[in-house]
């Protein structure tokens, strides 16, 4: 960590104007509908912490996705300055949080290098959050300030003492701005992984309280380590990663790391000033041209082209190549605001010159590595030639087929790809039902016999010789491979994988996804691939049958059924509560149960279910020992009354001296093993806790002496609302036969249309790639040649399996 220089309110330069942010958020943060703007909110805050790391003052960052879809970002940097800003008359922290383009990066002495995508600052995050809490640890004190929709609720105030320093920002994006507030683990992990590789030595912990998942990202070795990570579970062709880093006199910094592996796909990542370029740009063009030139020059010098009687191309050179190009440019030019493509012309020359120099030297100084790489390149050229011949054979056979389409394909009448659907169906029997049940105008059916080839393990020439793969390629019409592929010739823009809900169905679906991910990734990127979602249950009641789509719908159906002819009597003499009134109470109670289930990764339901019946604890009351002691006694009483065999609960108070509060802690002893659960201040301040106690208070106050539920002639005396609902659910379950549905072949054509193929009622999952690096690794681990990584994956994830079908 570097020594502290003067970093106070005088370092904060102000460029005013925040009014437009809420009116046109897309200009500042990206699309507010598709999730990109939502995730960029997190990246803006994380980038501030990375800037502290680049300045040498921070090496530990924590990002938490909370159960209510709020986000916390905490670092151990210097802490945002809290002294009064001379120009603005409020704390410097408040200036940073409320004024657009205010911050230390506009003062060259505070940050020499800074990241960030749009360069708008954390003030935009504040403006677009329904609530944001800023906590700063600095100069031995803890400072805190709360904002609602970007407006400070009170001045910055001291709330405790601390021996550490750093900044903690906890924000909840505004539902008024963002269409869908759901954070994707994959999108956040992808960016955080990149940042940890690009900033060696910085540790970033990503935690997801919704699922209990967490991952710590910290890598020494920069881009070299990044390439090694990308090639995990793959066999390298050149044993050592080629790497160079140079700072040129023209101000452009160039760093490249690369290594070939035994796969058949190229994986090139480009960055400018830590920002990824999805569409490449001038740095990629310079890299590709110099790579091909250097390798072809080496082949010519060694006389390998004549010896092997083959002509190599740039595509052959990049088969199985993993490479990262990172440039540092003082004033980069991009094709758009999202910076997906670099257009600075001077960067092409810089990358080309440095790559020519260093890579040519590498080939000459490492003859064994060079021969292995060139050997792979020549093999790729041979395979390309073999694939061309195989394609010609396929075309000759196809010429005999009048339509040029596979015989098994039942095509649709529609010729507009945007309106056409292709169902890839498992097996001929389900294919027959689908053909009879479909809408012939827009829906085409292609039955796939058996399991298609695993393309992860097969060379290109072998793959296109496979009958099932060949049939699929012909049906799609867009071709495959660099020479043949043309997305404009794709015959269907809706390709739907429809397989059974068993192990074989899952395997076939995985093989098809592997094929699309490896060979036709643009179809996935454009959102053309879908997975059909047939119903999960068939429910019989008497002679009536009904298909139900999933567990949530099943719970809804059974609840509705349980409430038929049911009534709740609040005491012995009270009139019955039934119909819409009872349904409303049940829905409120179910919403509480869902909240508790969501929280169960952090706090066991066996504890939190009692909070429904306990008085509310406010944040102020946490500081009152007597109040907390009385509340704790009630909790302990309930825990004792519900104690199960082999379990023991012991509740106590733990003092948090930093915040001057008393926190409930429960010791759970299960068969002699003790674990501890502490309910922290954030829990009692959360919306989830308030929802639980508010609805709990409402339901508890309803029931009096002699309360009971009744259904028909049967009745059950109850003390708590949950008792009554459980009894009604058990009663209705007895009257239903529930079958978990697995095979498409179990449905007749009409049922298949009504449940799975009718566009007005069907459910489908769109296949997307949010983290291409993680997707590459998972496909390689599960579908590749190496057995050991696959076994490790299965062993480490075995306990997470919720539905194992033998």
From Swiss-Prot:
This is DNA gyrase subunit B. Mg(2+) 2 binds at residues 500, 502. One of its GO terms (molecular function) is ATP binding. Binds two Mg(2+) per subunit. The magnesium ions form salt bridges with both the protein and the DNA. Can also accept other divalent metal cations, such as Mn(2+) or Ca(2+). Belongs to the type II topoisomerase GyrB family. It holds the Pfam family GyrB_hook. It comes from Pseudomonas putida (Arthrobacter siderocapsulatus). InterPro entries: DNA_gyrase_B_C (IPR002288), GyrB (IPR011557), GyrB_hook (IPR049353), GyrB_insert (IPR041423), HATPase_C_sf (IPR036890), Ribosomal_Su5_D2-typ_SF (IPR020568), Ribsml_uS5_D2-typ_fold_subgr (IPR014721), Topo_IIA (IPR001241). PANTHER family: DNA GYRASE SUBUNIT B, MITOCHONDRIAL, DNA GYRASE/TOPOISOMERASE SUBUNIT B. The record marks 451, 454 as: Interaction with DNA. Its cofactor is Mg(2+); Mn(2+); Ca(2+). Few gyrases are as efficient as E.coli at forming negative supercoils. Not all organisms have 2 type II topoisomerases; in organisms with a single type II topoisomerase this enzyme also has to decatenate newly replicated chromosomes. It catalyses: ATP-dependent breakage, passage and rejoining of double-stranded DNA. It comes from the Bacteria.
């Amino acid at each position: 960590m570097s020594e502290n220089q003067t970093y106070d309110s005088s370092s904060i330069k102000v460029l005013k104007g925040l009014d437009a942010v809420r009116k046109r958020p897309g200009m500042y943060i990206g699309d507010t509908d598709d999730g990109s703007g939502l995730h960029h909110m997190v990246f803006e805050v994380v980038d501030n912490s990375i800037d502290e790391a680049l300045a040498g003052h921070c090496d530990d960052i924590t990002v938490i996705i909370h159960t209510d879809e709020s986000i916390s970002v905490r670092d151990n940097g210097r802490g945002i300055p809290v002294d009064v800003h001379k120009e603005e008359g409020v704390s410097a922290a408040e200036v940073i949080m409320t004024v657009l383009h205010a911050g230390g990066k506009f003062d060259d002495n505070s940050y020499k290098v800074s990241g960030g995508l749009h360069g708008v600052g954390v003030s935009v995050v504040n403006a677009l959050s329904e609530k944001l809490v800023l906590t700063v640890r600095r100069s031995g004190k803890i400072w805190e300030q709360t904002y609602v929709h970007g407006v400070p609720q009170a001045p910055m105030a001291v709330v405790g003492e601390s021996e550490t320093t750093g900044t903690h920002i906890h924000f909840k994006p505004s539902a008024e701005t963002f269409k869908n507030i759901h954070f994707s683990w994959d999108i956040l992990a992808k960016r955080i992984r990149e940042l940890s590789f690009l900033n060696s030595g910085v540790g970033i912990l990503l935690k997801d309280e919704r699922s209990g998942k967490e991952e710590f990202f910290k890598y020494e070795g920069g881009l070299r380590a990044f390439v090694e990570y990308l090639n995990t579970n793959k066999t390298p062709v050149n044993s050592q990663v080629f790497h160079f880093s140079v700072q040129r006199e023209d101000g452009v910094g160039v760093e490249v790391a690369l290594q070939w592996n035994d796969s058949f796909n190229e994986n090139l990542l480009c960055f400018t000033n830590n920002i990824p370029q999805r569409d490449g740009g001038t740095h990629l063009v310079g890299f590709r041209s110099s790579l091909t030139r250097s390798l072809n020059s080496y082949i010519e010098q060694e006389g390998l082209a004549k010896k092997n009687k083959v002509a190599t191309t740039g595509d052959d050179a990049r088969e199985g190549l993993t490479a990262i190009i990172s440039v540092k440019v003082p004033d980069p030019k991009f094709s758009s605001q999202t910076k997906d493509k670099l257009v600075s012309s001077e960067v092409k020359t810089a990358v080309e010159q440095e790559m020519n120099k260093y890579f040519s030297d590498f080939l000459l100084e490492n003859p064994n590595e060079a021969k292995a790489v060139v050997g792979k390149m020549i093999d790729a050229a041979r395979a390309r030639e073999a694939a061309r011949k195989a394609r010609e054979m396929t075309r000759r056979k196809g010429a005999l087929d009048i339509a040029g389409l596979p015989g098994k394909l039942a095509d649709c009448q529609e010729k507009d790809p945007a309106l056409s659907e292709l169902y890839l169906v498992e097996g001929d029997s389900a294919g027959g039902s689908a053909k009879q049940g479909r809408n012939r105008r827009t829906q085409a059916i292609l039955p796939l016999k058996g399991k298609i080839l695993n393309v992860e393990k097969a060379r290109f020439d072998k793959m296109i010789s496979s009958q099932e793969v060949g049939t699929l390629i012909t049906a799609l019409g867009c071709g495959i491979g660099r020479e043949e592929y043309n997305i404009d010739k794709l015959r269907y823009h809706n390709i739907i994988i429809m397989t059974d809900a068993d192990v074989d169905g899952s395997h076939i679906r995985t093989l098809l996804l592997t094929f699309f991910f490896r060979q036709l990734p643009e179809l996935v990127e454009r959102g053309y691939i879908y997975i059909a979602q047939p119903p999960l249950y068939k429910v019989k009641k008497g002679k009536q049958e009904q298909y139900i789509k999933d567990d949530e719908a099943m719970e809804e159906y059974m609840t509705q059924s349980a409430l038929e002819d049911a009534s709740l009597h609040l005491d012995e003499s009270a009139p019955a509560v039934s119909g819409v009134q009872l349904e409303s109470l049940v829905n409120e109670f179910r919403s509480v149960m869902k909240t508790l289930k969501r929280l169960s990764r952090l706090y066991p339901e066996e504890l939190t279910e009692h909070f429904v019946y306990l008085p509310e604890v406010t944040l102020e009351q946490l500081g009152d020992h007597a109040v907390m002691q009385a509340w704790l006694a009630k909790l302990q009483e309930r825990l004792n009354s519900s104690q199960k065999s082999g379990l023991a609960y012991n509740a106590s108070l733990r003092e948090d001296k930093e915040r001057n509060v008393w926190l409930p802690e429960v010791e759970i002893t299960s068969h002699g093993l003790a674990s501890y659960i502490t309910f922290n201040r954030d829990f009692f301040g959360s919306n989830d806790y308030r929802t639980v106690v508010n609805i709990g208070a409402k339901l508890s106050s309803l029931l009096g002496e002699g309360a009971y539920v009744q259904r028909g002639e049967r009745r059950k005396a109850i003390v708590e609302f949950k008792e009554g609902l459980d009894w009604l659910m058990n009663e209705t379950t007895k009257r239903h036969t529930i079958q978990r549905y697995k095979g498409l072949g179990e449905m007749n054509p009409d049922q298949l249309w009504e449940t799975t193929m009718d566009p007005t009622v069907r459910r489908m999952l769109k296949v997307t790639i949010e983290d291409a690096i993680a997707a590459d690794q998972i496909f390689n681990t599960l579908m590749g040649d190496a057995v050991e990584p696959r076994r490790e994956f299965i062993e480490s994830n075995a306990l997470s399996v919720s539905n194992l079908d033998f």
